[in-house]
Amino acid sequence: MSTSNGTIVEIELPCKLSTCDANLLQRCEGRVLFLPFVRARVLLKDVDYKSFYIAGTEPDTLSLLSTFKTRFAAVITRALPGRMSAVVLGMGSIPNGLALQNTGPFDLCNGDTVCLMPPIFPNVCCRIRLESIDTELLFPVTVPTRLANEILAKTLSRAIEAIGRGQMPPPTSRESETIMYNGRSYTISPTLHSLDAAESTVRTLLLNMIFAINEGNMILYTMIPTLLTLGASDGYINALVGLETATRAVGQLIRIPNPPPLQDAWRRYPVYEALSAWITMTLNLGNVLSLHPLLKVCTFDGPANIKAGDLCPVIANWY
């Protein structure tokens, strides 16, 4: 249901849910669930842990991260008998006073933008088991944006290492990755259950990175002769190429010819098209590599630091 206070989704709970499990859900207010679709009413089985399975295979860190990008994040606002209410992020406004639960091991500070990542910290519990209905829920970890890229890079490097190792056993036991934040060290342990999925993800990523780097270099190579030629008559370009040193050195050795006219320059601009295509490709690659923060911590009269497990007021960060 879309209102002035945001898009609110009702998650229906089974009637067999026990009182103990209902109390567990009440403690999940402020946590995030990922919806496969946005409707007025959603079943609990649509957002439970088994909904992330791919062909009956338990998801690993990379597959969860990929699924998070394709689903709709929603913050649980109320857990009532028979249903839960959640506000969908990234669609319109959010209600005033929306609170996010800090599910990560880090303290969130006022002004921090928050990313949502799969559970990768061994000492942080991000699952709850509802025994009465045989259901398990998975919640993402809240991570400050300035740490998210480092964690993602280390997760991808672990996947590349696992793929390169193949079937050969590792010579020594692989130690857990460690990151530093505010003077403290934290251990991350990404899981790689399905190497086929990891290989597909990492292979696509690396091929696009290599292609983008190669295309960027080729565009630069085509522009270097023009840059040096213009440097013979333009003082500003002289400064750009190294205070006239490069231009003077090349001019003393060879006579740079005038650049030929661009092919079909009278009706199109090949250099512009190449640059436009390359910028678009790098932007798409950046969207794959980056984790977009949807929320920003904004405390007015409360504590500036939000401890793990506490609720913090947030505002939208997707505009």
From Swiss-Prot:
GO cellular component, one term: viral capsid
Protein's UniProt name: Triplex capsid protein 2
Coiled coil (residue ranges): none
Subcellular location: Virion; Host nucleus
Signal sequence range: none
Assembly and oligomerization: Interacts with TRX1 and major capisd protein/MCP.
Highest taxon of the lineage: Viruses
Matches recorded under Pfam families: Herpes_V23 (PF01802)
Gene Ontology MF terms: structural molecule activity
Keywords: Capsid protein, Host nucleus, Virion
Lineage: Viruses, Duplodnaviria, Heunggongvirae, Peploviricota, Herviviricetes
Function summary: Structural component of the T=16 icosahedral capsid. The capsid is composed of pentamers and hexamers of major capsid protein/MCP, which are linked together by heterotrimers called triplexes. These triplexes are formed by a single molecule of triplex protein 1/TRX1 and two copies of triplex protein 2/TRX2. Additionally, TRX1 is required for efficient transport of TRX2 to the nucleus, which is the site of capsid assembly.
Family as reported in the entry's similarity comment: Belongs to the herpesviridae TRX2 protein family.
InterPro entries assigned: Herpes_capsid_2
